[in-house]
């Protein structure tokens, strides 16, 4: 079953809605991004990453919600891990990039994504 924050994130990524994606990340969030060699440790770096991602006309993501595991750490704190596939275009051809993810979500916060790690599957 999909988590509402991940559905919101997925919909925003797939519609290239930068402000919606950006609004989900906490002011002190860290993003270890699929297509970046370095951890993104500020909101400016996170915004730059998604701005760059959205220059690709086919950039998008498909969650495999059946693979998702949720750990409830506290009343409003969850860790969610699983698999998704990034879509992008290279040389006019759609490319699928299988990846794994971990999110730390604080549901008590207006900007609930505290940490997001994403990496290509080996």
Which residues are covered by each model-predicted region?
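Generic hydrophobic alpha-helical segments
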Residues: 8-9
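Active-site-proximal loop/hinge segments that shape catalytic or ion-binding/gating pockets
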Residues: 25
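A beta-strand edge to alpha-helix "cap/lid" segment located at domain peripheries
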Residues: 1-5, 14-17, 30-33, 37-122
């Amino acid at each position: 079953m999909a988590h509402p924050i991940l559905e919101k994130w997925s919909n925003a990524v797939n519609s290239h809605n930068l402000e919606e994606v950006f609004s989900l990340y906490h002011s002190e969030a860290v993003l270890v991004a699929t297509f970046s060699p370095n951890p993104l440790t500020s909101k400016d770096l996170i915004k730059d990453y998604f701005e760059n991602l959205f220059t690709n006309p086919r950039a998008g993501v498909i969650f495999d919600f059946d693979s998702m595991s949720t750990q409830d750490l506290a009343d409003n704190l969850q860790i969610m891990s699983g698999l998704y596939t990034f879509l992008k275009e290279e040389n006019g051809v759609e490319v699928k990039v299988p990846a794994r993810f971990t999110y730390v979500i604080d549901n008590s916060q207006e900007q609930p994504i505290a940490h997001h790690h994403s990496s290509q599957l080996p």
